[in-house]
Amino acid sequence: MSRAAVPSVRRRLLVNLLVGFVLCWLSVAALTYHLSLKQVNRLFDDDMVDFGEAALRLLDLATEDQAGEDGSITEIIERSREAIQGLPLLRRESALGYALWRDGQPLLSSLNLPPEITAQGPGFSTVEAQGTHWRVLQLNIDGFQIWISENLIYRQHTMNLLLFYSLFPLLLALPLLGGLVWFGVARGLAPLREVQAEVQQRSARHLQPIAVEAVPLEIRGLIDELNLLLERLRTALEAERRLTSDAAHEIRTPLASLRTHAQVALRSEDPKAHARGLLQVSRSVERISTLMEQILLLARLDGDALLEQFHPVNLATLAEDVLSELARQAIDKDIELSLHQETVYVMGIDLWLKAMVGNLVGNALRYTPAGGQVEIRVENRAQHAVLRVRDNGPGVALEEQQAIFTRFYRSPATSSGEGSGLGLPIVKRIVELHFGSIGLGKGLEGKGLEVQVFLPKTQPDATRPPARGPDSGRSHI
């Protein structure tokens, strides 16, 4: 894409402001022209009225002067002509023309009055003569009529001069305004360039928030969202580095055990010892496989949940399916496994919720001794679906209850060497992604451990995930 085709805030602001200035200038010019023309026409019309009234008064005076004498109409006309010609209004570039009538007979007229001009009646009218328009005024008094005409070209010329002297300074100011607009836009967008320069200097290891103290209010929201994104990236990268480091450390032990058992099996000449070695190799491989599966699951859970994949899930049915898969493990250890469920729906993803229930029940079966009990309850509360997994095993000491949600943590009192230390961290993350909370308590008969999961319940036909509440993802210990 060419540079000119790339959207530019600066270019858009400049164009909008400059076009706005030009449109405002044209609007002011048009309004000024209209108002000035109206005012000028009124002033010129008033001049024509004053001229006509003055001419009629002079004619009346000339008639009175000759009334007591034996004067002819010709003398009256000549005296009137001399008086009218002396009026100031006739000295302005011969703009006005006039004609004097008495009882329908012409008495005198000016040389600049076209013969084809005729008044349309008393008052003002506009007529066309000699290819131009004329303003004509007819006044009547005592049998006399006077026509005063004015070529509108003179008015237009006067109007053009007035408009030129009024608007030309504004026209000269347009380039200055354009320069000020350009400077103002460039200065106003300077914070964007500063933010751009700061972001360009960032590396993959430098994900600290951008300072917002000097950021204008208009882009502070953008910077806040960018800082949130940087924080999420920093958290994700730290979690990935921590997971990689912890996984490398945790997988070293089962790999060493696998190597040892394989070497023993290879060196042993006793068939029974050889078989025992291969069995240990198989168990080590299974443990490594389980560990890797949980590491991969936890890595996927470190990303945000895809809310568009959420749908109503029957938690009671899901728990029943999980228990049917783990029944053999309970039978092998002679553990009484029971389920008490109420139908309740939660909004979520089946596979993740199944992994959550499976990890909780699997942990209970793993750490409960032979002949023990594991109880699962699914309860339908007013606003929540509650999952309870209780056992009568050794439990977890109070000072360790917060630590068991840490990745790869295994309690010294309960560790059998089989767990990966990822089960409860996976459960907690799944609960957080489903807008729920998790807590710990006493198990069956006042001993062992109870894990409580609270999830927002929904309707079977719901289509939207629940809103995140204030306690979402919080552990209640």
Curated annotation (Swiss-Prot):
<dbReference type="GO" id="GO:0000160">
    <property type="term" value="P:phosphorelay signal transduction system"/>
</dbReference>
<dbReference type="Pfam" id="PF02518">
    <property type="entry name" value="HATPase_c"/>
</dbReference>
<comment type="function">
    <text>Member of the two-component regulatory system PmrA/PmrB that plays a role in the regulation of resistance towards polymyxin B and cationic antimicrobial peptides in response to limiting concentrations of Mg(2+). Also autoregulates its own pmrAB operon under Mg(2+)-limiting conditions. May function as a membrane-associated protein kinase that phosphorylates PmrA in response to environmental signals leading to activation of specific gene promoters.</text>
</comment>
<keyword id="KW-0902">Two-component regulatory system</keyword>
<dbReference type="InterPro" id="IPR036890">
    <property type="entry name" value="HATPase_C_sf"/>
</dbReference>
<keyword id="KW-0067">ATP-binding</keyword>
<dbReference type="InterPro" id="IPR004358">
    <property type="entry name" value="Sig_transdc_His_kin-like_C"/>
</dbReference>
<keyword id="KW-1133">Transmembrane helix</keyword>
<feature type="transmembrane region" description="Helical">
    <location>
        <begin position="13"/>
        <end position="33"/>
    </location>
</feature>
<dbReference type="InterPro" id="IPR005467">
    <property type="entry name" value="His_kinase_dom"/>
</dbReference>
<keyword id="KW-0472">Membrane</keyword>
<dbReference type="GO" id="GO:0000155">
    <property type="term" value="F:phosphorelay sensor kinase activity"/>
</dbReference>
<keyword id="KW-0812">Transmembrane</keyword>
<dbReference type="InterPro" id="IPR003660">
    <property type="entry name" value="HAMP_dom"/>
</dbReference>
<feature type="modified residue" description="Phosphohistidine; by autocatalysis">
    <location>
        <position position="249"/>
    </location>
</feature>
<keyword id="KW-0547">Nucleotide-binding</keyword>
<feature type="transmembrane region" description="Helical">
    <location>
        <begin position="161"/>
        <end position="181"/>
    </location>
</feature>
<feature type="domain" description="HAMP">
    <location>
        <begin position="186"/>
        <end position="238"/>
    </location>
</feature>
<feature type="domain" description="Histidine kinase">
    <location>
        <begin position="246"/>
        <end position="459"/>
    </location>
</feature>
<keyword id="KW-0418">Kinase</keyword>
<feature type="region of interest" description="Disordered">
    <location>
        <begin position="455"/>
        <end position="477"/>
    </location>
</feature>
<dbReference type="GO" id="GO:0005524">
    <property type="term" value="F:ATP binding"/>
</dbReference>
<dbReference type="GO" id="GO:0005886">
    <property type="term" value="C:plasma membrane"/>
</dbReference>
<dbReference type="InterPro" id="IPR036097">
    <property type="entry name" value="HisK_dim/P_sf"/>
</dbReference>
<protein>
    <recommendedName>
        <fullName>Sensor protein kinase PmrB</fullName>
        <ecNumber>2.7.13.3</ecNumber>
    </recommendedName>
</protein>
<dbReference type="InterPro" id="IPR003661">
    <property type="entry name" value="HisK_dim/P_dom"/>
</dbReference>
<dbReference type="InterPro" id="IPR050428">
    <property type="entry name" value="TCS_sensor_his_kinase"/>
</dbReference>
<keyword id="KW-0808">Transferase</keyword>
<dbReference type="Pfam" id="PF00512">
    <property type="entry name" value="HisKA"/>
</dbReference>
<keyword id="KW-0597">Phosphoprotein</keyword>
